[in-house]
């Protein structure tokens, strides 16, 4: 059956021989403070523990924080019990810890691989919608602002990997990277736990929570502009027009969901189901692009998953004109089911392809021998540099990066 579900081309499989993953984390919070905590934690991880298990537990933390808000904030406007906000803050802290320890564990056990990178980023992509819902529920800004927050979250994520596809390196900003966002979210949750969520509802139509969302959005826009600028300045790349063409899937997806949210009441009637359906769809689209980047494969401009999305959007457009073909709620559930099935198929068969080719397993790794030679040592040799953890003084532009300062994240 696997021959019918091959998400990586033969060209992509062949290109894995040239794989290396390098990145620069300029995070102020990470380099100045949290780095020491991450290094401390990795001292306690046993050598038999696969990095992907750490990554999976981090995803479970995000699912846990989402379920808390799902139960207590069904319309994204309710006030949850104070303990919920402290619990969410703890789970975010646990997630950011695990999200950084998994890479260190991979280096520690000499088990770095393309599968590990893909697994890590796919879990992060799935978490975008959950973070949007959780933070919006905390700020009590309602479904439409939650939808806006989701779009604000997915674009910087997609563009970061778009830039990496062409630059060959993932660069995270000093004050506008994921670590700073997670720290900000933790602070918001702790403040809400202490003072209650009513502090975010001050104001009439423009509340404190909405103002906070706008400020976060400005940071996201700045990050996106940096991605465009850095990619435009790159030398030895394809023409910038062809680079922009690779954004077709995310542009089409954004246009479709904006139209859908504009013509349908589903976003207010089923806010959690609506946003999570979009989140799983984005996770799939983003994961396909990450796979193509990791394998240096050709980028697809259209995926079959867009067909059911277009059909459901057209169904809602007709319903807004009193032409009812299928109940919008039923159509939403069908799309949710299709999205889950497609994502699971992609995850299973892509993992199988990589494991078969690399001769590795997803959740187990060979115990390293005394010589330190592991089964994935060939990938370690392909890294640009292995340096001791230290503060980074690298700028946000890829032009400023010194190869000796590159490390695997």
UniProtKB/Swiss-Prot annotation:
UniProt KW Iron-sulfur keyword: no
Protein location: Membrane
Residues annotated as transmembrane: 53-73, 83-103, 115-135, 141-161, 183-203, 205-225, 243-263, 265-285, 299-319, 329-349
Domain of life the protein comes from: Eukaryota
Pfam families the record matches: CDP-OH_P_transf
Chain spans, region Disordered: 388-409
GO CC, any one term: membrane
Membrane topology: Multi-pass membrane protein
A molecular function (GO) term: phosphotransferase activity, for other substituted phosphate groups
Keywords: Membrane, Transferase, Transmembrane, Transmembrane helix
Biased composition regions of type Polar residues, renumbered to the chain: 388-401
UniProt-listed GO biological process terms: phospholipid biosynthetic process
Chief subcellular location: membrane
Keyword Lyase listed: no
Family: Belongs to the CDP-alcohol phosphatidyltransferase class-I family.
Protein name: Uncharacterized CDP-alcohol phosphatidyltransferase class-I family protein 2
Classification lineage: Eukaryota, Amoebozoa, Evosea, Eumycetozoa, Dictyostelia
Encoding gene per record: captB
